[in-house]
Amino acid sequence: MLENLCTLPLSADLFAQALHPEKPLLTVGLSSGHVHTFSLPPAKKDGKGLIKEIWSTRRHKGSCRCLVYGHDGKALYSAGTDCIVKHFDPETGKVKSKINIPKRGNHDDPPAIMHALTPKTLLLGTDSGALYILDLLKDGSLSPEPVRKHMPHDDYVTSITPLPPSAESTSGFSKQWVSTGGSTLAVTDVRSGIMARSEDQEDELLCSAIIPSGLGPKKMRGNAVVAVGTGSGVLTMWDRGSWDDQQERIYVAGGRGKKEPESLDCIVRVPASHGSGTKVAVGVGDGSVCIVDLRRREVELTLRHDEVEGVTAIGFDCYDRMISGGGKVVKVWAEADSPEEAESEDDDEDGSSKKRQRDDDDDSDDSDSDDDSSEDEKPAKSNSKRRKGKGPLPGTIAFPGLD
């Protein structure tokens, strides 16, 4: 069972969220164009710790729509409605390189999605439906111009999910990916281009995640399966290699008598440490997070991120804690202690309290003061992300009930 450890308030609506692959770092991009990076507390048994802001800046004029870490976590990339892609240091926020997004004719073509496919390849999708392939240099810097351009869908790309590399792969990195956009799913190869495109699903396909093995058809359990979230609240299942049409449907937030279907806006595979490795966490338009067991084809657990705003981003950090984002809030979730563990911790705390009273020492804890501050700037006018709508940010946020 997952429980909410803490809630991190934001100064503007969340448009993008990225998690460092190896360190407890969370970076958020806001509707105001600001980008903030926070250090999450380590996963200690006592649960004590602080969320600390490492740096913040107004990275883009307009909104920051996309954020992604490089494969090794040494580079961070952002893209905004100013039609600029920036590469910067995750620890300091210092910009190292930047490029302009190609125009669509004489008009700007703002970003819709970004994904680091390999250490040498960055994928960038735009509002016009273009999908650009960008080369990355040895230090993670951006190449001046895209090396390829594809149009896999009639609308903008809503999700990108790499397919597992083949057994013949020498690099160990994927060269193919599944994308969704409009009402279709497509498969693209970094060299060969668009390889497959599904039939019209007559429903908006919004997000996707892959289960590498364990869910394929009989006698092919090792075959990968892609789960796709839709605008009607239904999760569709696709077998690798059978890209014409979906194979199964799971009703998560719509269908089968549900009054108001809610969109499934984001999805992530739940780590095997939380179960069988065949579950996904889905962010829903009504502000809930659903844990879906794909093997049993059912919703296992529903959590509440927000009462009003939908969940627009979801992921797991390096300690397998779930991070959900939406509206002006980010929440951190972790496995709840079992009753036996909780009772044991209470006993330990009682004993420690009595010992402190006996010792009567006068030691004091040193506290770090963060004097970093961002410039006072008026927030930019909110820009809609993907054609839909939005006091200073505190430097440290404590877990509820803890020092």
Swiss-Prot record:
Q: Keyword check for Nucleus, yes or no.
A: yes
Q: Where in the cell is it found?
A: Nucleus, Nucleolus
Ranges of Acidic residues compositional bias? Answer: 337-350, 360-375
Residue stretches of each WD repeat: 9-48, 59-98, 105-144, 200-248, 306-343
**Is Hydrolase one of the keywords UniProt gives this record?**
no
Sorted alphabetically, the keyword list is: Nucleus, Repeat, WD repeat
Q: Per its UniProt record, what InterPro entries does this chain match?
A: WD40/YVTN_repeat-like_dom_sf, WD40_repeat_dom_sf, WD40_rpt, WDR55_POC1
GO cellular component, as recorded = nucleolus
Q: Segment Disordered: which positions?
A: 335-403
What Gene3D superfamilies does the database record attribute to this sequence?
YVTN repeat-like/Quinoprotein amine dehydrogenase (2.130.10.10)
Family recorded in the similarity comment: Belongs to the WD repeat WDR55 family.
Q: What is this protein called?
A: WD repeat-containing protein JIP5
Q: Which organism is it from?
A: Pyricularia oryzae (strain 70-15 / ATCC MYA-4617 / FGSC 8958) (Rice blast fungus)
